[in-house]
């Protein structure tokens, strides 16, 4: 079966033919590739084509596809049972592994997705502060729970849908939206609203393309939250263990009240978490009145994969330097080639995360990101795919470097960039 036939068949039985909207390739006026398998830095579609994969399952695969250590850990766990709905030692082991490197985090709760993590963190913040409103930032995506699907990035930006049908106005009215990297917009909202339970932010935004928050902006944001008895939530579902081993904390050293984790923490399996100090976490059920639960939360396969992934990342002391060097080479190379062709391009990286926009102006917020030339992006994506490079099929997503990549892979990619720029 070909990719084209597979998508046509999928559309008969799966809504939209995919189980997450951006996978449909609609934003690049194309059809998705159906993947048969992956190995290291590469994926292979059912037509027999191979691609250097810069999506890496949208971030979780720090060590690329089919990493032997993670596979071995999963196989060992699977032989004992896939899920019990009861505590296992693996949950405590992964909890200790995560908390040991964050002095301000004392307890953690595992869930199965980033959406669950942020949704639960919001509920926890409201329960702890006894306040109703939440403040988020335009273009930041925190999963698809109702209160957070307001002025969202990621898929919502891809489909020009800042919110969603089905999100009740009575729910959305409790969500305040500020401008990313603009502290004055935050101050204005705090002046008008005295019942803000929490501020949630991607400290390294990866869902409007890659847009890191400025250090002084985050520092001032933390002060405002503290002065108003408002909890600060860092959504590190994407940036955790990606931007650095300690995510944004390893870069900006700001201690958020709650951190959400995901992607890498599950080593490629469905897992996420939220963590905070004990006085906050202890109001979760069964100790307190904030309810959160999940049938597969902390399941042994995901915990085993997470332990293997984080243990390996922690042991490889030069891993993040290598990934950052490769990401820098890629983004600087893209910028140089664009300049040579007279194409407007902004490109940047943070650790193993990278992004690019077809615009002449620097990008520091969602409105800047929206200025990117989407027609150019679409043409570029199509040409890169034809040249064997698999990039995220949306301008408003982030790319990822994995440990199986090297200078040769980047050189091949930059040659594909050169050829693609010639055609667009």
Curated annotation (Swiss-Prot):
The gene is hemL. The keyword Cytoplasm applies. This is Glutamate-1-semialdehyde 2,1-aminomutase. SUPFAM superfamilies: PLP-dependent transferases. The keyword Acetylation does not apply. GO terms for cellular component: cytoplasm. Homodimer. It catalyses: (S)-4-amino-5-oxopentanoate = 5-aminolevulinate. It is an enzyme of class 5 (isomerase). Pfam families: Aminotran_3 (PF00202). Belongs to the class-III pyridoxal-phosphate-dependent aminotransferase family. HemL subfamily. Pathway: Porphyrin-containing compound metabolism; protoporphyrin-IX biosynthesis; 5-aminolevulinate from L-glutamyl-tRNA(Glu): step 2/2. GO terms for molecular function: glutamate-1-semialdehyde 2,1-aminomutase activity; pyridoxal phosphate binding; transaminase activity. Keywords: Cytoplasm, Isomerase, Porphyrin biosynthesis, Pyridoxal phosphate. InterPro entries: 4pyrrol_synth_GluAld_NH2Trfase, Aminotrans_3, Aminotrans_3_PPA_site, PyrdxlP-dep_Trfase, PyrdxlP-dep_Trfase_major, PyrdxlP-dep_Trfase_small. GO terms for biological process: protoporphyrinogen IX biosynthetic process. It is found in: Cytoplasm. Its EC number is 5.4.3.8. The modification N6-(pyridoxal phosphate)lysine is found at residue 263.
